[in-house]
Each structure stands twice: as structure tokens, then as C-alpha cells.
Design a protein with these regions (language model features):
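Terminal amphipathic alpha-helical/low-complexity segments used for targeting or macromolecular assembly
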Residues: 1-143, 259-273
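Structural signal for interior beta-strand "rungs" in well-ordered beta-sheet cores
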Residues: 145-252
Length: 273
């Protein structure tokens, strides 16, 4: 028991996110023995957070055409070439727990949240895309769309610290960019305005909050820490630290907080602007 405690303390110093997840998993094993197989196979069987996340996402993407094992091997190649993908896993977990009032455990995104799973599936698809393995990347996009009800083109560049709440109905087009620390809710579209090729999708800068059902169309910039109200249709660039709302969206005024993606504050005063 003492040796196990020493190992846990050492892990907490080296990888506190993974240490916390393992501790939460052990607590579930004690409290919910019916879930022992799930918890052991998904969390406690693995020696790193990367292995646990890869296992969970690969199992959810498993199909008769492309097995979970093949997907795990592709992840292994990606993580060996770009260890920063594992750092993004951690940043997304912390962002999710920090911003979602419905959860306070790091384990929950890994086990249960399809928004987290969809983003991590995209990270592999994007790596494959950049390596010229476009058919495998397209396959993962298609499979992820069926499994998680999200459709993210594998060419899309996505930063870290991303929170995708509920996830259902997210659509992100090929030339879109999503920078670090962005929060998005369900039914968001980052789309084009026609059938022209080239750079035609939105650029979402750091710290932006995009409300449920918002549609942002065209090659326009949403400035850092801007806030897009739920249900808005955005057709023009949005300045940084600004709230827009409506169909079509109009400027309501400056944000009442400097980091809307972290506070998740969707409300604004009727007399703003």
C-alpha cells in the first residue's frame, strides 16, 4: 500500500491530469463495481493518458471496415511523430472541466463526452491529412460524423484548450481555422458562402465563444475573445472582445468579460450597444 502511494504521488508530480483521472477511476471502481470492466479497460489498464484516450476514441470509431486496432496504430504513429498531440489531449480535458458546470472530474470527457472524442478523432485525421494519407483522413471524418454527429473536414486547423459542448450538429469546413481556447456549443456551422474553391471559411481567433446554433459563413475573421450569441448568422468580420447577435448578426457592444470562452457567459444586456 505504501509503495502504491509513493507511485501515485510521483505520477501526480509528473502528469497531474493523468494522476487525477486514475484516482477518479479507482473511486468509481469502489463505488460502481458494475462498471469495473469499462473503467479497467478504458483507464486503469493503460500506463499513460495518451493510451487511455486513444483506446476510448478508437473503440468508439471501431467498425468492420477499419478496426479499432488499426486506428490505435495510426494514433501511435501520430503521437510518436508529434507528441504535442498528447499535450492537446490534456489541454482539452482541462478546458472541458473548467468550462462545463455539469462536470468536475477529468475522467468524464475521456469516458463519456462525444465533443471531446470528436476533437481527438479530428486531431488524428488532421495529422493523416498533413502526411498525405487523405483517404484514411476522410474515412475518419466520415466515421466520426456517424459516431459523434459532428462533421469536421480533416484539413481544418484546430488549436488546443478546445471545449465542444454537446457537439451534435457541428459542421466545420475545409479552410476554417480554430485557434486555442475556443468554446463552441451544438449546431454551430463554420461554413462557406458558395461553391468557389480556395480559402473560403471562417478564422476563429483565440478565446472566442460561439453560442448554440450560430452560423458563421465565409472567409471572415472572428477576433480574439469575441462572443457570438446563440442562433446568430454572422456574415461580416467581428472585432476582438466584441459581442454580436442576430440574423444577420450586428454588433451589440464590447464584452463584459475579457475571456468569454472561459467564463461561458452567453447573456448580454438588452441596452448594450
Amino acid at each position: 500500500m505504501a509503495q502504491r502511494q509513493v507511485r501515485a504521488e510521483a505520477l501526480d508530480k509528473v502528469d497531474p491530469v493523468w494522476a487525477r483521472i486514475r484516482g477518479e477511476a479507482e473511486e468509481i471502481m469502489r463505488r460502481e463495481p458494475e462498471l469495473a470492466t469499462l473503467i479497467y479497460s478504458t483507464i486503469l489498464h493503460h500506463d499513460s493518458l495518451e493510451a487511455a484516450v486513444v483506446h476510448r476514441v478508437a473503440e468508439r470509431l471501431d467498425s468492420p471496415e477499419v478496426s479499432a486496432e488499426m486506428i490505435r496504430q495510426a494514433y501511435a504513429d501520430a503521437l510518436e511523430a508529434e507528441p504535442s498531440i498528447g499535450e492537446a489531449f490534456r489541454a482539452d480535458i482541462v478546458a472541458t472541466v473548467d468550462r462545463d458546470p455539469a462536470t468536475n472530474r477529468y475522467l468524464e470527457p475521456v469516458l463519456y463526452f462525444k465533443g471531446f472524442h470528436a476533437i481527438q478523432a479530428h486531431r488524428l485525421a488532421h495529422w493523416l491529412w498533413n502526411k498525405g494519407r487523405k483517404d484514411f483522413a476522410y474515412y475518419l471524418q466520415s466515421r466520426s460524423s456517424a459516431a459523434f454527429q459532428t462533421d469536421i473536414n480533416p484539413a481544418v486547423r484546430i488549436g488546443r484548450g478546445i471545449f465542444l459542448d454537446h457537439a451534435t450538429g457541428l459542421v466545420v469546413g475545409e479552410t476554417a481555422v480554430i485557434e486555442d481556447d475556443v468554446s463552441m456549443l451544438q449546431e454551430v456551422t463554420l461554413g462557406g458562402t458558395g461553391k468557389e474553391a480556395g480559402d473560403r471559411h471562417p478564422k476563429i481567433r483565440r478565446g472566442v465563444l460561439i453560442g448554440a446554433g450560430a452560423k458563421i459563413l465565409g472567409n471572415i475573421e472572428i477576433g480574439h475573445c469575441a462572443r457570438i450569441a446563440a442562433g446568430s448568422v454572422v456574415l461580416k468580420p467581428v472585432p476582438h472582445n466584441t459581442t454580436v447577435a442576430g440574423v444577420p448578426a450586428r454588433v451589440i457592444g464590447p464584452n463584459s468579460c475579457s475571456e468569454p470562452s472561459r467564463t461561458m457567459d452567453h447573456l448580454f444586456e438588452d441596452n448594450d450597444g
